[in-house]
Amino acid sequence: MRKLFKKLTLSLMLCFLSTTLYPQELVVEMLSGNLDDAEKLAKAYLEPFGKSFGTSLNNGWYTTAKPHKLFGFDFTIMAAMAVPPSGDKTFDVSKLNLSYWELQDPANKLTPSVTGDKKDGVVLTDKEYNTATLTLPQGENLDFIPAPIIQLGFGLPLHTEVVGRFFPKIDIEDLGDFSLWGIGIKNEFKEFIPGFK
């Protein structure tokens, strides 16, 4: 079951994110020059994906507000999705306070993030000699960010339910391992409020 889910998850991620693989290689190019600048550029470019992916993982914890009865349970396999905010489709390079790189054209300072439009990023040049240039990667026009998830809910005493969420460990070549889990609790506390039914 774990192998099947691993393959299914990898397949879903590759289907939805296959278009983002090539531009991510360009993030490595940002490492040429100054490491601090590379960190700022990579963070600004990739952060909208991380925020949206995190939001999609935070969705769908329940399908009903009523907790399970004692020892009742449900098992769910789902794909949560989040829509990246339009304000995260670009970022302003001039606000990053880069120390090695500067904008080749100061009037053109907005560049796409990974979730932005598929157009070339701005061109940077080294501040000291103006000989090296770096073209920032284009966006991937991601309208939504998916997250496949396994979830189990289990009923406890006192109208309480514990919910566990799991994304199995996946080894992504050259990037490392990725996994996550989370726990949530639901309680029907209205029984503790006098006169409330």
Each language-model region and where it sits:
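Outer-membrane beta-barrel biogenesis signature
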Residues: P23-D120
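Bacterial Sec-dependent N-terminal signal peptides
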Residues: M1-V27
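Residues on the lipid-exposed face of transmembrane beta-strands in outer-membrane beta-barrel proteins
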Residues: T64-K66, F75-I77, I150-L156, I183-F189
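Short loop/turn motifs that connect adjacent beta-strands in outer-membrane beta-barrel proteins
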Residues: T63-F71, S86, H159, D174, ...
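Transmembrane beta-strands of outer-membrane beta-barrel pores
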Residues: A79-V83, F166-I170, F189
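Transmembrane beta-strands of outer-membrane beta-barrel proteins
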Residues: F71-I77, T160-G164, I183, K197
